[in-house]
Amino acid sequence: MRYRRVQYGLVAAILPRQRRKIMYQDDYRRIDEMMRKKGVFTNLETGKQYYTGYEYATLYDWDQYFEAIVQLYLGWQSDYARLGVEIFLDTQKENGHIQRSSDGSEYQLLEHVKPFLSQICLLIYNRDGQVDFLSDKDFYYFNRLKRYLDYWLLRPENYYGLAFWDSSLHTGMDNQRDRAGHWSACYCCGVDLNCYLVRECRALALLARILKHDKDAEIYDAHAERLAQTILEKMWSPEDGFFYDIDRRTGEQIKVRYIGAFATMWADVATKEMAKSMVENYLLNPREFNRGFIYPVLSASMPNYIEAPLPEDWGCSWRANTWIPTNYYVFEALRKYGYVDEATHLANETYRQVKRIGDREYYATETQTGCGLDPFWGWSLLAYFMPYENESGYDPTKILVEKNDKILLT
């Protein structure tokens, strides 16, 4: 059954524009104060300062991309974002591998950093107009960026060039074991991962052109196009009208529907018809993703769609739970493909729910309550900027060179 597009009312328009601006400024001042007080730490090995939303001071890979967007909106200098990238690149091994967090368990440190470092550098360039730190010392950090991305792209175990996660913990969606397995499982070619890689290759290609490394730009543009084509050929299910991960051991699709499939839209990989099926048959379907606190990270039709953790779970819960960074990139994806009303509803509803419940690490979808760290000053704070992006049309996640002078805290 196809679920029709709904004409959502503009929730934000209920309040007069000037009153909304005052309300948003109050939000921005409050979270800016909290972030400055709680989120800045110093790396003991390098002495470099960085930002993290975690009270135990760990710097995580994809978190810092979304956290950097918040910092820039609040008018912060790009230093913490830059130094966070450097901290990761400083740990690089000869083969290009970088641990995915600044500290953690033995297994965690064996897993490669998620592909967001070049995208963070592009955020920095669009704010500052330069990325000199990449070219300093004979392009020391730029060369490390290339090696880290090549580690993902050129592993001989990849399936038709599709990269794979080491475990469910590695995906960042900690307990989605149904699709990615336990520690060192190493079989899940994630739709999410390979779409992040498409974006990361395009971002590194842009940085290469900025640094006048045109040959490198051609190489990573070609990687992006090859990956995008393989995602379309191998991961799309014509029968279901949905993208699925691949088990690299068998070549079979892993029939778990999760929010990361919509990264195909965020990365401009899905065709218009594919996006139409995914949005209208799944995202808007109450039996799939259109639940209480939109949108859960796992479809409600999946067997393990529950809020409580299961035995053998590690980390946080990514099942019947709503996480703001995935809401955020689904919001950007909807706008890209012309789902304006749905994007508006998602932006306003995410803001409303976070404002009501509070700044939490994540949320229980069905009971609409907060979970995890309380308070949390990490990527969940993106919720406060989604109404602005919706009203202004601005998208800081676009992979292009575009001056970012959007400082919202006045």
Language-model segments: residues:
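Acidic/polar, glycine-enriched structural segments that form the non-catalytic walls/loops
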Residues: 2-57, 131-154, 208-210, 214-216
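Extended glycan-interaction surfaces of carbohydrate-active proteins
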Residues: 19-58, 83-107, 157-189, 229-322, ...
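Structural helix-adjacent loops and short alpha-helical linkers that scaffold large soluble proteins
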Residues: 23-26, 72-85, 124-146, 206-225, ...
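Alpha-helical scaffold segments in carbohydrate-active enzymes
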Residues: 30, 34, 87-90, 144-158, ...
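Aromatic-rich carbohydrate-recognition surfaces in CAZymes
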Residues: 57-64, 68-167, 191-194, 254, ...
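Structured, solvent-exposed acidic/aromatic patches
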Residues: 187-192, 214
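N-terminal accessory interaction module
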Residues: 406-410
